[in-house]
Amino acid sequence: MLGRLTGLLAEKSPPQVLIDVGGVGYEVDVPMSSFFNLPAIGEKVTLLTHFVVREDAQVLFGFLTAPERETFRMLIKISGVGPRTALSILSGLTVGDLAQAVTAQDASRLVKVPGIGKKTAERLLLELKGKLGADLGPAIGGKPASDAQADILQALIALGYSEREAQAAVKALPAEVGVSDGIKLALKALAR
């Protein structure tokens, strides 16, 4: 029904945003991966959307990239995975990380996502096997080389940097850098 929205970003309140399209405000739920990459309030934004109509609600879900939306649509087709759970999965893992977990059949990565238990994780791995390509990983952002780099990336995102900026800063760090020193170096690089 609604495939895309282009308008001004009026409000941001995780996980929801308000997009002003020609004087009409659309409330859109977005995964945190998209939320952290949104422009500043008042700037133009385009979101690919998926509209869910239920007996008690009509909810619009938005995504910055087509792979995110397609993955969301794959997830909600799986028994026991509704739109909120799918949004939670895409907030906890990038599409690339999810693809890598599916390829490696790594349920432990999926159970780290809030709301995903062992049985649901195993069902996801079974249902998505062969459907979600591992080749998506590098195209969507890939996986940090180490746990320290993953922690640095999370810290930078928590400080308000976009995922893209944070990934570029982490990529420029020496491989064996610790979390504390890595954050300091990344912040210096981002300040330039």
From Swiss-Prot:
The family database entries (InterPro entries) matched by this protein are listed as:
DNA_helicase_Holl-junc_RuvA_I, Hlx-hairpin-Hlx_DNA-bd_motif, NA-bd_OB-fold, RuvA, RuvA_2-like, RuvA_C, RuvA_C_sf
Annotated function:
The RuvA-RuvB-RuvC complex processes Holliday junction (HJ) DNA during genetic recombination and DNA repair, while the RuvA-RuvB complex plays an important role in the rescue of blocked DNA replication forks via replication fork reversal (RFR). RuvA specifically binds to HJ cruciform DNA, conferring on it an open structure. The RuvB hexamer acts as an ATP-dependent pump, pulling dsDNA into and through the RuvAB complex. HJ branch migration allows RuvC to scan DNA until it finds its consensus sequence, where it cleaves and resolves the cruciform DNA.
> Which UniProt keywords are given for this protein, alphabetically ordered?
Cytoplasm, DNA damage, DNA recombination, DNA repair, DNA-binding
Asked if the keyword DNA-binding belongs to this entry, the reply reads yes
Q: Which SUPFAM superfamilies match?
A: DNA helicase RuvA subunit, C-terminal domain, Nucleic acid-binding proteins, RuvA domain 2-like
Where does it live in the cell? Cytoplasm
| Official protein name in the record | Holliday junction branch migration complex subunit RuvA
GO BP annotation list: DNA recombination; DNA repair
Note down the stretches annotated as region Domain II.
65-139
Record's CDD domains? Answer: UBA_RuvA_C (cd14332)
Q: Which GO terms describe its molecular function?
A: ATP binding; four-way junction DNA binding; four-way junction helicase activity
**Gene Ontology cellular component list:** cytoplasm; Holliday junction helicase complex; Holliday junction resolvase complex
Query: What does the record's free text say on domains?
Result: Has three domains with a flexible linker between the domains II and III and assumes an 'L' shape. Domain III is highly mobile and contacts RuvB.
Q: Which family does it belong to?
A: Belongs to the RuvA family.
